[in-house]
Design a protein with these regions (language model features):
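Acidic, metal-coordinating catalytic cores used for nucleic-acid/nucleotide bond scission
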Residues: 24, 77-81
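A secondary-structure boundary/capping signal
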Residues: 19, 74-75
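PAPS-dependent sulfotransferases, especially Golgi type II membrane carbohydrate sulfotransferases
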Residues: 29-72, 80-153
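Conserved phosphate-donor/acceptor-positioning beta-strand/loop module used by diverse small-molecule
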Residues: 6-31, 89
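Long, K/E/R/D-enriched contiguous segments that form extended
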Residues: 1-5
Length: 153
């Protein structure tokens, strides 16, 4: 959401847009119980609205600054072929040296779980069946919010 501010403050900044399947993303957000710090994540309805709003915002910035303003990385593709994507990310960012999986595993990061940063990239968060009884209503809410944005254009 702060893309333009960052771009103005750091004109040479590179922007990586990592996105994933909306339902998988919703499950992940909901399960983390971010209700105090990320209020919309306390319901699938709130997540659906926020996800559609985020999609609209990304569309806006890509129309404003062109398709090359961001390097788009689909999460599902990243976890299937992480080495290929890591090399693309390094090249896009103009980083010198080589990627080191060993260093990545030793890195400390602030995420929902320290174990998420230190363990190997895993594929178990793709196409989850958790909360399946809410899937259809989530997709309907997501589509309704997408339609809302289309009507405003």
């Amino acid at each position: 959401f702060f893309y333009k501010f960052i771009k103005l403050a750091l004109p040479g900044a590179k922007f990586i847009h990592c996105y994933r399947d909306p339902w998988d993303n919703a499950i992940s957000l909901f399960k983390q119980n971010y209700s105090i710090s990320v209020f919309f994540a306390s319901s699938f309805f709130g997540i659906a609205l926020e996800y559609a709003n985020y999609e609209h915002l990304m569309k806006f910035w890509k129309e404003q600054d062109g398709p090359d303003a961001f390097l788009d990385v689909k999460y599902e593709d990243l976890v299937q072929n992480d080495t290929n994507y890591i090399n693309k990310l390094w090249e896009y960012c103009g980083l010198q040296g080589r990627y080191s999986e060993e260093k990545r595993q030793k890195h400390f990061g602030y995420t929902a779980s320290f174990q998420q940063v230190t363990k190997e990239i895993y594929k178990s968060s793709v196409k989850k069946a958790d909360f399946s009884k809410f899937h259809q209503i989530f997709m309907s809410d997501l589509e309704n919010q997408r339609e809302y944005w289309k009507k405003l254009q």
